Amino acid sequence: MECQRCPASARNPATVESRKEKFCDECFIKFVSTKQRKQMMKDEYFRNLFKVIYPFEKEGSVSKILLPLSLSDSGSLVMLDIVHDLLLEQTKQHNNRTGFTVDVLTVFTEENVSVIKERMESLINEKMSQLNKISNIFNVHFIDVNEFFNNASEVSTFIIDNENFEIFSKSKSVDDSNILTLKEILGKYCLNNSSRSDLISIIKTQLIKHFAYENGYNAIMWGHSMTKLSEVIISLVVKGKGSQIATFLDSESFDTLNNKPCKYKNLYPMKDLLSVEIESFLQIRNLAQFLINVEETNVKPNCLIARKSLPSLGQQKLVKNMTINEITNKYFQDIQNDYSNIISTVLRTADKLTQPKSSMAKPSQCQICQSKIYTNPSNWLNRITVTSPYPVETTEEKYLFKQWQDSKLGQSHTHYVELLNEIKQGASNSLDVEDGDVKLCYGCLILLNTSIKDKNLVWPKVDTMDITANATNNNKELSQILDQFEINSDGEE
């Protein structure tokens, strides 16, 4: 088989087959890179961000771009590789000048800090140090996921009244004796893997957006492929967060955070690429070595002709043990080689959605995920749900009720009622208007009601957070890597 894009006089052997077309390695790399660069130049705002603007002394001629890099995600790594090549081209064409600088942000946990250190050392040495010898084009930042809790001066305990779905909260100040950690939140409050996955995703997204807001970036480049975006869209619908889809995909408007306007826009440069194409690019460019899950990456579906590989049956989870995100991921991974039109249809349909009309008296944002709230979910659930129990009457019913009260489930319910009454009392005595008017989006309300222990969750107050306080230098060993390769940032000192 020969490449269909090479000149007829010198066709190379085909190594990739995607979208019913055959490519050699070189043509496929060009195909993927062109798809990403086209998105980076999608409108005037982004064109002005990424192109080299003359004169160089003009204020704002060099844009600041934030690139969240996950070393367990192929998309963000491939995106970084293509951006690196674009910057290299600009330095050659414009006398060592570039139109933008890139700040790479990695959010890490205690469990993976050592392997991230190892992989980032290799990545910095191979992909960033060359350009930084010319100019300070790449900056690298690290944030411990626990900074989401450490940098908030106040936390709120949210609880749902299961009689009418009304939400109450109680705020308290944070000091060294009561700082929360991710491990504590996931272990103490989450009842299943789906709730853990949702909270981790919310925390990481909020950390990245706060970092962008506080440091004045012009854009955040997310490494979501077309497949990944479709997965997120379906997951949002399943979780009761379908109203967030239009905002999630919006790359035309400036973002908002805690009802405050931001100076950056969100961009998805990989949205025209399937995840199998990204995995193939990863293998061709030998980028898998930088990921922390190399073995898992090597068995992901791709569109390489000679190196296609699929997970063995022994590696697959049972559906009942999978999170909502994992189920949607499996579905789209299974169909994307043969039915990629389904994936593109999901994304095209979602792109046409607009934000719902709000029925709220004033603009509100969810206290947990920070999404916009368009209608009060508590009122709607209360109208359609019967929550009052049937009274206990017979001797047998009283006996069974007593058994239930003495069980772990009954004791948990007793603890929930006590906590609810305590928080209700605190809310009624509070002079803080915000505490008396707590709002959660429908998805987070359902999460709290069904997947969180005792229907209560302790969560930082977003407007009291300062993410940059400990960014980059919260791990000395990681900072030493940056020093070694002269990849520095202003927030590092």
Curated annotation (Swiss-Prot):
Main location: cytoplasm
Gene Ontology CC entries for this record: cytosol
Compartments reported by the entry: Cytoplasm
Highest taxon, organism lineage: Eukaryota
UniProt GO MF annotations: nucleotidyltransferase activity; sulfurtransferase activity; tRNA binding
Residue numbers carrying Phosphoserine: 489
Record keyword Nucleus present: no
One of the GO BP terms on file: protein urmylation
Membrane-spanning ranges: none
Pfam families: CTU2 (PF10288)
Pathways per UniProt: tRNA modification; 5-methoxycarbonylmethyl-2-thiouridine-tRNA biosynthesis
Keyword Nucleotide-binding included in the entry's annotation: no
Keywords: Cytoplasm, Phosphoprotein, tRNA processing
Family: Belongs to the CTU2/NCS2 family.
Protein purpose: Plays a central role in 2-thiolation of mcm(5)S(2)U at tRNA wobble positions of tRNA(Lys), tRNA(Glu) and tRNA(Gln). May act by forming a heterodimer with NCS6 that ligates sulfur from thiocarboxylated URM1 onto the uridine of tRNAs at wobble position. Prior mcm(5) tRNA modification by the elongator complex is required for 2-thiolation. May also be involved in protein urmylation.
Assembly notes: Interacts with NCS6 and URM1. May act by forming a heterodimer with NCS6.
Name the UniProt record assigns to this protein: Cytoplasmic tRNA 2-thiolation protein 2
Organism encoding this protein: Saccharomyces cerevisiae (strain RM11-1a)
Gene field: NCS2
